Swiss-Prot record:
Protein's UniProt name: NAD-dependent protein deacylase
Pfam families per UniProt: SIR2
PROSITE patterns: SIRTUIN
Top-rank lineage group of the source organism: Bacteria
Domain comment, as recorded: 2 residues (Tyr-53 and Arg-56) present in a large hydrophobic pocket are probably involved in substrate specificity. They are important for desuccinylation activity, but dispensable for deacetylation activity.
Function, as annotated: NAD-dependent lysine deacetylase and desuccinylase that specifically removes acetyl and succinyl groups on target proteins. Modulates the activities of several proteins which are inactive in their acylated form.
Cellular localization per UniProt: Cytoplasm
Chief subcellular location: cytoplasm
Reaction catalysed by this enzyme: N(6)-acetyl-L-lysyl-[protein] + NAD(+) + H2O = 2''-O-acetyl-ADP-D-ribose + nicotinamide + L-lysyl-[protein]; N(6)-succinyl-L-lysyl-[protein] + NAD(+) + H2O = 2''-O-succinyl-ADP-D-ribose + nicotinamide + L-lysyl-[protein]
């Protein structure tokens, strides 16, 4: 089977009702990003950070995978598929995909404030006073601005092995994820799916599809299945 790597971003989950990462005004669901998604914000007002992520975690139980998520899961019948997602939701998992690398963490897990390897699955609200086994406060298992991306090397390794790379639902503006495609083999076929794909200044070997995730995957599926054989 050929190796297919998917790099997914907020655009694919937006079609399930999850708001995209940031609006044009630099706010994230009405919040200053640095207030709710940085070590600075956590130190300044941990309760505000917890409230923000508790709200987002609750929202997960009100949304469902869309046809684009399901199409990517369907491709496992034809390819060795690895999904590298910038999203912190679980919609790829619920759609049926089996190999998913969450580059920026997950809403449904929390970790020790002191030890990033002490991680717990968590579906309820997280509160001040909820402690890890090392007695430190639990925090969202999210890679915040200013923090290293621990799974970056693994993601780069997957991209290097890809015969085919599909970039879907990302503006390619959040680094280091935005530069992942540059690690693809020179002979790899690359598709970039985004409503504003044509505005991106990308190399000629990247085929831009100026559509939403759902529409583009519906159109592309027959070709992808044919190419797998």
């Amino acid at each position: 089977m050929k190796n297919l790597v998917i790099l997914s971003g907020a655009g694919i989950s937006a079609e399930s009702g999850i708001k995209t990462f940031r609006d044009a005004d630099g706010l994230w669901e009405g919040h200053d990003i640095m207030e709710v998604a940085s070590p600075y914000g956590w130190k300044k007002n941990p309760q505000k950070v917890l409230d923000f992520y508790n709200q987002r975690r609750r929202q997960l139980f009100e949304v469902y995978p869309n046809k684009a998520h399901k199409a990517l899961a369907e491709l496992e019948k034809h390819y060795q598929v690895n999904i590298i997602t910038q999203n912190v939701d679980d919609l790829h998992e619920r759609a049926g995909s089996s190999r998913i690398l969450h580059l920026h963490g997950e809403l449904l897990s929390v970790r020790s404030e002191k030890d990033p390897n002490l991680v717990y699955r968590w579906e309820k609200d997280l509160n001040l006073g909820d402690l890890a086994k090392d007695k430190s406060q639990l925090r969202p298992d999210i890679v915040w601005f200013g923090e290293a991306v621990p799974l970056l090397k693994e993601a780069i390794s997957l991209v290097k092995q890809a015969h085919l790379l599909i970039i879907i639902g990302t503006s390619l503006q959040v680094y280091p994820a935005a530069s992942l495609y540059t690690h693809a083999h020179k002979d790899a076929l690359i598709y970039y799916i985004d409503p504003k794909a044509k505005n991106a200044h990308l190399p000629q070997n990247v085929q831009c599809i100026n559509e939403s995730a759902v529409h583009a995957m519906q159109d592309l599926m027959p070709k992808l299945i044919e190419m797998a054989s």
